[in-house]
């Protein structure tokens, strides 16, 4: 085997390990480098042309999460509820590497994901109730109190508030109480 072929094979093996998540890739900004540069401000896009990371929701009530991007990889766990929000952090062909609200990561086929936006109310604080307001203001009337870990559809977000709509309730909640939207993210109906 020539040296050039050996180098190509080694580089290909490293690339595959990065794509399947065996070798983590840490952005320069996470190492304290490149902050404030133009590159650090650019939106990263995946091979699909969509931004990375981004939130989506599960489109089925049974979704296998695999250890790698393919049906030949073992199932790590199974989601058993549709509409749960997950964060896409990587793409490989038709597979999406996702992260759930607990920080667990795995691969899901893109056909099992939906662009419909949902969020979980404060999953990090299971002792609390949160006011759902009639308007996007802390002084607005209270439409309902929502329990932590409640799943809700996100209709719109702007200026640190999100409008949640459900067959049981409708109103505004502070954006920082939700897992499934980014800080200051704008979501239009």
Task: Mark where each language-model region is.
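Generic structural signal for short, solvent-exposed loop/turn connectors between secondary structure elements
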Residues: 1, 16, 159-160, 167-168
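N-terminal secretory signal peptides that target proteins for export/translocation
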Residues: 1-7
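Bacterial N-terminal signal peptides
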Residues: 10-24, 29-32
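SH3-family beta-barrel domains
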Residues: 34-67, 78-82, 89-92, 99-101, ...
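Second-shell loop/turn segments in exported
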Residues: 69-73
